[in-house]
Amino acid sequence: QEEFGAVVMMTETDWNMTDEPAIYQEYPKPIRHLSASDGSTLNLGRTRLRFMETPGHTPGVLSTRFTVYDNGYPHEAFLFGGVGLNFSGVERTEMYINSVQRLMQLEGIEVNIPNHADSGEVFDRYEMLQDRQDGDPHPFVDPESWDAWLDILKKNAQSKLEREQRAAN
């Protein structure tokens, strides 16, 4: 924000979290600008971002659904804002699993835009994109990998939940 003047948008839950003592002291507290909630939208030019609260990684994770285009053809994309399992507690892990299960119910998602580049085979897909020829499918348009990725997230979270439950007892 200091360097680029970026406007920050978060859920009220996560804005409230920023008022708590910082866990990561090396990051400055963000300046509060905009709040979003489940079902809210933001138009950027002709692109409409549709927001979904997907708690787990933080209590108020914000995820985004939007339309992308390949040679004029629309495809539904989704950015899951809280992929990481680097948190603790049974309740938060259950929240995460519930969020993943909710994402599994979404229809029509064809493009996975992960919030961390090492997730969702981003670099491999980028390399395929560099060699793409006319008529080749776009490597990021891959609805089957979206479903498979969510299955992996759920399985990993269920394993974490078992560990968290053992630690709590």
Describe the residue ranges of each PLM region:
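Active-site HxH/HxHxD metal-binding segment of metal-dependent hydrolases
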Residues: 1-41, 141-143
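N-terminal cationic amphipathic segment used for targeting or macromolecule association
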Residues: 4, 131-140, 155, 166
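Noncatalytic linker/hinge segments flanking ATPase motor cores
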Residues: 25-32, 48-55, 117-124, 155-164
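Metallo-beta-lactamase
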Residues: 41-43, 48-148
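C-terminal regulatory/interaction regions
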Residues: 144-169
